[in-house]
C-alpha cells in the first residue's frame, strides 16, 4: 500500500509525465500532413521535423540525469520544462519548416523523462516501485491513445499552431504541478562512477537496444501512416479521430491479456509481443496500398504489441538500478528511446523522399524481423532474462 506521501508524489509525477508525453505524441498523427504546407517544406524536412525532437532529447537526457543526481530532481525538471515551453512557443508562431525544426529541437532539449522516472523511484519504497512504474506506464499508454484523438481534433480546427498552443498550456500546468512538489535533495555529489560503465553494463544494455529499435520503427511508421490514409485511401484528416480511436480501443484486446500475464512470465510475453509486432509490419508492407481492412487489422496488432513492450522495458530496467545512479541510468535509457525517434524520423523522411511509402513500410518490416531474430537467438527480450 502507498503511504499518503507516496500517493501524492506518484499522482503529481504521473500527471506531469502524462502532460509531457501527450504533448510529445500529439504531433505524430498529423505532422506529416500539415507540415507539407509550410514554407520550404520537403518530405525529408518533414521527417527531420518529426525526428529532431528525438535527437536533441537523446543528447540532453544524460546531462539532465547527471545534473538531477547532483542538483536535485525538482530543479532540473523545472529547467527542462521551461526549455520545452520555449520550443513550443516557436513552433506555434512559425509558418517556416526550418523554424519549426528549431522549435522541435528546443522541445526535445528539455529532456526530463529520465529525471522524472528517477524522481518516481526516489519517492516510492522498493515494495511499491513496480506498481508506481506500472501506473506511469498506464499514463504513457493513455497519453499515447489520447494524443491520437486530441491531435487530429485540434489540428482539424486550429491546424498545427493550435496544437502547439495546447502543448504550451499543458507545459505551464506541468510547471505549476512541479512547483508544488517537495524539493528533492541531491542524491549524489560525488561522481564516482563512469557513464560508459552504465551504457555498456550487460544487465542494462539490452534495454537500451530494445527501446531504440522500438521507437525507430514507431516514428518511421507514423511518417507513412497519415500520408497513406489521406493519399492512398482518401480518408480525410477530419476522420482521423474516429480512425485512431477505433484502432486503439481494439488494440486493448492484445494489450490487456499480455500485460496481465506479464507478471507470471515476462520473457514469454515480450517474445510474443515482438512476434506480433513483426508480423503486423510484414502485413503492412505487403498490403499498405491495396487493402485497408488488412492494414487496419495490422495496425491494431502493432499498437497492442507496442504498448506491451513500451510498458515492460522500463519496468524491467528499474529493477536493475540503484538510487545513486538511477537518474543517470534512466536518462541513458531515455536517450536511446529518443535517439530512436530521431533515427526513425531521419531514415523515414529519407526513404519517403527517395522511395515513397513502400520504402518506409519495407524498412519497418525488415528492422523488426531482424530485431526479433537477434533477440530470439540470444534468448532475451528487454533484458528480462538477465533479471531471472
In which residue ranges do the predicted regions lie?
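Intracellular juxtamembrane helix-capping segments at the cytosolic ends
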Residues: 112-124, 308-321
